[in-house]
Amino acid sequence: MGKVQILAVLTIDGCLSSELYGKAHKDLRLDRCGLDEIRKNALYRVTPDYSISMLHEWREDGTNTCYLAEATPDTADYIYGLLRMQAVDEIILYTIPFIAGTGRHFFKSALYEKHWTLASLKSYPNGVCRSIYALDR
C-alpha cells in the first residue's frame, strides 16, 4: 500500500515556518536535521496539482510508494484538504524553537477525530524536535 506523508516545519505556537523569518530560520541549520533525507525517500513530491482522489487511488495500488506533501504557507489549504479528506498516512512535524506570534497555523478546526501513534521522536542540538506520527488503522 502506498503511503502519503505530510512534512511540516512549525514554530512552537503551531505556525508554519517560513524562510521569511530570515536569520532565526537560517541559524537553526535545518539542513542538518534530516529534512533532505525525508525528501529524497519520497518517490513523488505531491503538490496542489495532484487531486486528492488521485492520491486515494495511489495509496491503494499495492506498492510501497511514498508520496510526500510539504506544508508551506502557500500549500496550507491543500494540506488541510488532504487531512480533511483523510488522505494522509503519516505526519512528520519539525518543531523549531521560535514563536512566530502570527502566521498561518498548520492545524485548523473542523478536522475529523483521528488517532495517531508516535512512531519516532528525535531532538537535535539546535533545539529542533522531529515527531513522526503514523495513522492508527
Which residues does each PLM region occupy?
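Enzymes that bind and transform nitrogen-containing heteroaromatic metabolites
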Residues: M1-R137
